[in-house]
Amino acid sequence: MAGHEVRYGKHRTRRSFSRIKEVLDLPNLIEIQTDSFQDFLDSGLKEVFEDVLPISNFTDTMELEFVGYEFKEPKYTLEEARIHDASYSAPIFVTFRLVNKETGEIKTQEVFFGDFPIMTEMGTFIINGGERIIVSQLVRSPGVYFNDKVDKNGKVGYGSTVIPNRGAWLELETDSKDIAYTRIDRTRKIPFTTLVRALGFSGDDEIVDIFGESDLVRNTIEKDIHKNPSDSRTDEALKEIYERLRPGEPKTADSSRSLLIARFFDARRYDLAAVGRYKVNKKLNIKTRLLNQIIAENLVDAETGEILVEAGTEMTRSVIESIEEHLDGDLNKFVYTPNDYAVVTEPVVLQKFKVVSPIDPDRVVTIVGNANPDDKVRALTPADILAEMSYFLNLAEGLGKVDDIDHLGNRRIRAVGELLANQFRIGLARMERNVRERMSVQDNDVLTPQQIINIRPVTAAVKEFFGSSQLSQFMDQHNPLSELSHKRRLSALGPGGLTRDRAGYEVRDVHYTHYGRMCPIETPEGPNIGLINNLSSFGHLNKYGFIQTPYRKVDRATGRVTNEIVWLTADEEDEYTVAQANSKLNEDGTFAEEIVMGRHQGNNQEFSASVVDFVDVSPKQVVAVATACIPFLENDDSNRALMGANMQRQAVPLIDPKAPYVGTGMEYQAAHDSGAAVIAQHNGKVVFSDAEKVEIRRQDGSLDVYHITKFRRSNSGTAYNQRTLVKVGDIVEKGDFIADGPSMENGEMALGQNPVVAYMTWEGYNFEDAVIMSERLVKEDVYTSVHLEEFESETRDTKLGPEEITREIPNVGEEALKDLDEMGIIRIGAEVKEGDILVGKVTPKGEKDLSAEERLLHAIFGDKSREVRDTSLRVPHGGDGIVRDVKIFTRANGDELQSGVNMLVRVYIAQKRKIKVGDKMAGRHGNKGVVSRIVPVEDMPYLPDGTPVDIMLNPLGVPSRMNIGQVMELHLGMAARNLGIHIATPVFDGASSEDLWDTVREAGMDSDAKTVLYDGRTGEPFDNRVSVGVMYMIKLHHMVDDKLHARSVGPYSLVTQQPLGGKAQFGGQRFGEMEVWALEAYGASNVLQEILTYKSDDVTGRLKAYEAITKGKPIPKPGVPESFRVLVKELQSLGLDMRVLDEDDNEVELRDLDEGEDDDIMHVDDLEKAREKQAQETQEVSETTDEK
């Protein structure tokens, strides 16, 4: 027997063909959401408050300080929030201290700071009753970046940019004349020496002393001449910078100093963030810049006078490591004191080293480092600017390297916590201005924190983010896999990110640093390709937001691959050589072969085993969760694998789903972490279990109660239904499944079914990827799904009186009311068809001038006889089904309703949809098709043992698409079915062709795994042997029921009076310009005239035509289309006197604008009137017309 048995949870064993020992379990797959939010609650929120506060008033006599904050209990539970369309949020209370500096008086007070949405255990938020997800954003990391560009003459120029988290950009660039310039905040460029002089180093010699001799420095100094001798060089430089930043304003050195301080050196206005400081220090660090250079001076320990490194030594990694302490300490540190006119007058500490130029061995190049400012320094320092300039000048000397912006060391993830902190900061900054004004205006003695704080800007910022940000998305809830994928999504779009139109090919492309961090397969097709990605299965964020991936460490001394796991970012990985997970190992953990396949900085090649530093932990660390669910992924073309991964996320939950015979072993973990199942929180014993709830007695005696969700409507209209898995008496461990969620079976993801599939053509019905299906799959509800739709009706107060929910509806027979209760609301369990009343509702009509008789009736019977019109909620087209639930909300019951609404009724209708012709089906390998024919079981081809085939696919769909994985799955699936086992074949480590044929033979199948098939209609065998097997097929969310649409009479557009378009508006089919040409070409003038008049916008014509058809009279001639009248009115509005004349030169009267207009938006009323008129004439008000 090939393979070995593996247990997945308590309910499923699979035969696994993996050969690689897994040394690391998959992390919790939604930790990117939950950990980030927890960090925000624990520390992120506190940091935001500490950033903005304390706030002083303008005279600095009062100060508002932050003390702490506390979250109280949420107002609603999760379930209540869903039912009431509320948000699941907790009130936050913040303690402030108001200090009066003149009197020393201190007032401390707790202030309510609004309701803050709280993340559920599943990593989602409930906002206004809907489940939402905050997608993590992939953005360019703050830091310093260097780039090179070649001009049209082939000359290489260099550029550099310091990008902060917030604040102004500082850029450097060279031109064709070898002069270096700087730009501040995208303004016009100035020589870089101007900025150096503004920083207080004004002499030419001083500048050369800092940066060393080079052509760029000399050329720039020559260009930067002293124009105004009455100013000092520093003042002149400051004025020049001010002129660039504020053109047209009077320039003084003082205003320029304060402007530059505000732009770069004030931590409130300029923020590199922790990650930016880390990146700047890492890039400008002297150790990486000295690596492999030849030192041109003796390095001497200042304290002892000992020579650490002699001139002429190559600074290899080992040399640098030997003097690392000195490099991090005071080795070659120089203190430069700026002159008195400088922007910042504190002394500037730099580290300077001289090395031999790599281009010209006779020249010496100076390397200037920023002496590693502390991590807490979030603004730029003059040392940073000088060190950046030095690196930039060194690039022209062949030192240092330019940055690749698409490298994942330069792109980071902003997860939920950080996005929320940014929003909160924006709100607090708006609040700060408000607070400062109130503190200054009001009387100091009576002020309390409560009085000066207005929380509205903060709550508005948070609300806006959750409600309308591009990154706050309605959760994709088609099935558990789509939930899980959505929570792990990484988007490069959104505020502060890229835009679709500007993103080029490079940003979207797969980069070598994506390995183990972002999935190279799973991304949408279309305009967002490559901009929306998914986290790889083992990906994990570090504290700076860079994605790490785990590797097994290789002990270089013994050559053994240890089980020690090291998490590396893309930057760190660049320094090492990493071997693949499938490298053969001996029993003792050493490499079995001298040469192994490995990667180093994007080069995939063979390496000697002795130079390998790390080994991948698992073959599936390259791909995302959805991709890791595709068996035989290694045999599929990547374009089709992309479709396969995306289509699994569109699978509809079936009534009785089955886990795949051929899985990958990911099904258990994906189901477990998705949040759709019920998972035990503690160990214990089941003491009660039914469909609605499970009770578990813990070992300490306390009782856990788990509620099972039954048929709740999911975000995408499918049934979210959980099924209990445990019985009374079962022993449960923490993490065990208590109930399956939708699309799960026995604790495993089960998106579809395992039908018997044959690759063969049949009467041409599977042309172009169409799917032929057996009627068995319809009759036995194999691909049946339940869909829930929600309809609501509300009663409001109108000017003419309140609307009412009632059974007494005008002009409706008793038959139509048979399923309504005494209030006029449909009963639960009623079967409804389109047009049936769900909630009876009447709205008062405008009173006409009453006749004497009517006034008398009013006086006698009170208000009863006034006119009302029927505004009942009816079942829309395609909405028939069974009433699953009715919820009623009224003010009397204490429900919160919108203003003006007295009562809200919600009706849920369940539909059972069997699979039918036109539904879309797919396998897991990107093989998708539409059901073209459902064939009776007796006509389907059958196997020699009499088993009819369930599905026939077109064999031509395989070769050109190069997704051979489906054929391998087919054969292995048949073997698994015959053996009665389930199989796991993990990606890149699955069943080999030998394993496949061994299993086929073990199952007693023919050696080619094909079989003779017999035609069900004739009983004759088909000419050739056919590949028949079991393939996992899923039904996708694109169902024909949602797309089929027909209209006879419906709403019209208000201005043009043409039918609306689209299924949602119950619109008509557009007969466009080209279609008109077709009828013109055939000379079909009458048909064309009908289409352009009656069937479109001839208002009176269509009424008369309707009347004529219902009475059986000849149809009258059409009139003038409404759109023509609109045209006439447009021309008249331009001042042109446009009239329409008939053939006898008499003016044709056009319908006037106000004629017959109602206050309704859409015009179906005219037709209704015609119907009523006809009904009165014939006087046959029978039950049957009532029912309709």
Curated annotation (Swiss-Prot):
InterPro entries, A to Z: DNA-dir_RNA_pol_bsu_ext_1_sf, DNA-dir_RNA_pol_bsu_external_1, DNA-dir_RNA_pol_su2, DNA-dir_RNAP_su2_dom, DNA-dir_RNAP_su2_hyb_sf, RNA_pol_bsu_bac, RNA_pol_bsu_CS, RNA_pol_bsu_protrusion
EC code(s) of this entry: 2.7.7.6
Any one GO MF annotation of this record: DNA-directed RNA polymerase activity
Catalysed reaction equations from the record: RNA(n) + a ribonucleoside 5'-triphosphate = RNA(n+1) + diphosphate
Keywords: DNA-directed RNA polymerase, Nucleotidyltransferase, Transcription, Transferase
GO-annotated cellular components: DNA-directed RNA polymerase complex
GO biological process: one example: DNA-templated transcription
Domain of life: Bacteria
PANTHER family: DNA-DIRECTED RNA POLYMERASE I SUBUNIT 2 (PTHR20856)
Complexes and interactors: The RNAP catalytic core consists of 2 alpha, 1 beta, 1 beta' and 1 omega subunit. When a sigma factor is associated with the core the holoenzyme is formed, which can initiate transcription.
Job description of the protein: DNA-dependent RNA polymerase catalyzes the transcription of DNA into RNA using the four ribonucleoside triphosphates as substrates.
Family the UniProt entry places it in: Belongs to the RNA polymerase beta chain family.
Descriptive protein name: DNA-directed RNA polymerase subunit beta
